[in-house]
């Protein structure tokens, strides 16, 4: 109906909140009461629905790029709420108005997450091209480059950031587990530093909120770079201060000199430049129809149809969520589990993670 006015962002958000609370909360909000009788009669289906629902989208947590893509996909294929739910909860099927409001709300929320990073033109889609560059301070980038390659950040002057994140090896060291000071082996492999700027969290267990927090981890790790306590940044600063020329150059940008805060800030600023724009697929997303083959275009349509974007979303096509490793098979067959295999739970301390 052409006379129907489009919803404002506020209206879409209000309708979405009402709809979720009335039609989605049973499975997507913690604390849902489970009737033991109904669960038994359903063969455990009720409990599984609630478990899987809260794994997919927890309504009490702020929406992320991944949860937005998941919501968008199930709305597009009309799979939520599932038939097994609507059959016993009359009136829970989404109306067209509710569905359209939720789709608009999803785009509005996605714009908040990626708008400044990739621009409004691309932020509304589940996938976005990697931007040509991120805003950075060139002077800080230059200092960060030097620190990224500086072995003096380690106790025995043998390990730098680049030791485990070699730019000649796709931002990694190509080893099952990385080698730290005194030839010690870490418990997990080094993730690539390329496009890490787009990740929602840093480290495999998400314990760092951003690049700067991540940069502060390895120097204070007894296995990786050898230091252990926050006060040890003073020892690192003392070593760097012995390099008079570098210290003078550094103070021109950071008047307070070498500290844990300034060192990690410079490294993070440099890491923002380690992005990979203008791949053929990036160019295709920007509108160049000739950038990829017809077969690749078919593959992208299949990618969207099957819901691959519900995990592989954003400009880096991933790095936005923590997924359950038990969904498709036993990833730990043939070896003993280690503490690192706990993933997010090591940081969150939640058994559900």
Q: Model regions: which residues?
A:
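Aromatic- and Gly/Pro-enriched helix-to-coil junctions and flexible linker segments
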Residues: 1-121, 138-139, 143, 211
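Post-cleavage N-terminal segment of exported redox proteins
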Residues: 1-11, 78, 91-142, 217, ...
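Residue-identity detector for threonine
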Residues: 8, 16-19, 32, 40, ...
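Sec/Tat-exported extracytoplasmic proteins
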Residues: 23-24, 28-31, 50, 54, ...
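Axial heme c-ligation environment in periplasmic c-type cytochrome domains
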Residues: 32-40, 56-68, 72-98, 130, ...
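Short glycine/threonine-rich turn/loop motifs
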Residues: 34-57, 119-217, 282-353
